[in-house]
Amino acid sequence: MATKQEEQANLSDVLTPSMSLTELEMKFADETDGKAKDVVQARIKKAEDGILPLRLQFNDFTQIMSSLDEERYANVSKQEKFQMIRSKVLGLTERLQELSNDFEELQPLFATVGEYSKTYKNKNFQVLENLASYNHRGKAGASISNSTPTPAAATPTTAPTPGAGTKKAAKTAPTPTATATIGTPSNNAPTPATTATTPGTQAKKPRKPRQTKKQQQAAAAAAAVAQAQAQAQAQAQNQNQNNMQNKNISNPGMNSNMGTPVMGNPNMKQMQSPIPANAMNNMNVPHNGAMRPSVPNGNMGNPSMGNLNMNAPNMGNPNMNNPNMNNPNAMMSPMAGQGQLNQMFPMQNHNQNGQFMGQQSPGPNIGQMQFPPNNGNMNGMPGTSDMNLGMNPSMNMNMGMNLNQITPANILSMNTKGKDDQMQNIGMDQNQNQNQSQNQSQNQNQSMNMNMNNDSNNPKSAYDLVDFNSLDLSSLNMDFL
């Protein structure tokens, strides 16, 4: 034990903390104290010899830990296993601690290796790891590690040739410090990898508008298709409406909302006078031109009540003795003035002379109602409750005929014109009735048969639009004679 303590004392005197290379050389060169070199060599030999037993002891410990479940340890109790493992661990830690103490005592010598390589330009000795962190002395170890430069670990270990090798070593000598400072945490310079990747990520952003263009094109195509479909639907709806209107015009008996056709003027095909639906549905005028009110006494009510029964207690005989009633041309003209009926369904009552019995109230001014020359008779129909106006084109209720346009030639052509239009409309009625549903076709066939029977019974009243025997030409413009 004394010898071991003496060796430690001698080694501590030789290898002092923060010792420089020159001081170590001076101690080794002192002839008076020639034991210093021998003491350092003996301690290095001891540390080197302690490495192999430590490795063998560690291998034994790992083998025992891996074979605890084998059959050879089946009869061993758990307590014995615990004690065996504990002894192996303690022996391993003791051997490791001895090796650590030997390296710690030699730490001042290892610190001079880097300085030796720089001074003598010899790289035969390069420390792979600095053991200053394992120094339990604290400040001394820290001062040693800070004072000595850290050698580069990537430098080759081959010995250079004398002569030219020294020049190459002089040129490459600063490389260890340069390589050491590049990887230190104190260097805050950004690495080139981060600067290189940033433009790469930003260069990918312009690709997004390409996708948006495709999406915009797809959306525009979809919008165009939708717009074309909407236009096609609108055109189909308009065509259907036009077809329905054409059917209604060609067959006025099918639509209760159609106006009264005008057949007196050769220059005008037909004029429509809008009449409320409830009034048109409840009115019917046969080919003989007589209006048939639903009330037996021939009274006519207010159309605002939804019914065309017009209650006129002072009318008495339905024959109306208005001077203009005997003149069908005056009734046909919208310019007849005082002799025309300005409102079809007035709100007040009439007497037999066509005079108003009360104050005129605002009512629906539907149009000028024109009666055919049938002596103004209004035949009562007690079996019905409403007035029904038939929408056959042959009915004698013509609207708005101007007397100034009537000439002898027009008077002669009115009869033939009415016959041609009547036959054309009857043919169109028959074609339209075939395209309707079964229930509507049956009803219209019945109405057509009734109209044809009336025409056959009284052909003169059906086709002769003007009765020359009852014409009053006193109000005609005779300038053309």
UniProtKB/Swiss-Prot annotation:
Entries under InterPro entries matching the protein: Med3
Compartment list: Nucleus
Coiled-coil blocks: 79-107
Keywords, comma-separated and alphabetical: Activator, Coiled coil, Nucleus, Transcription, Transcription regulation
Family matches, as Pfam families: Med3
Region called Disordered, residue ranges: 140-261, 415-463
Biological role: Component of the Mediator complex, a coactivator involved in regulated gene transcription of nearly all RNA polymerase II-dependent genes. Mediator functions as a bridge to convey information from gene-specific regulatory proteins to the basal RNA polymerase II transcription machinery. Mediator is recruited to promoters by direct interactions with regulatory proteins and serves as a scaffold for the assembly of a functional preinitiation complex with RNA polymerase II and the general transcription factors.
Protein name, as recorded: Mediator of RNA polymerase II transcription subunit 3
Origin species: Candida glabrata (strain ATCC 2001 / BCRC 20586 / JCM 3761 / NBRC 0622 / NRRL Y-65 / CBS 138)
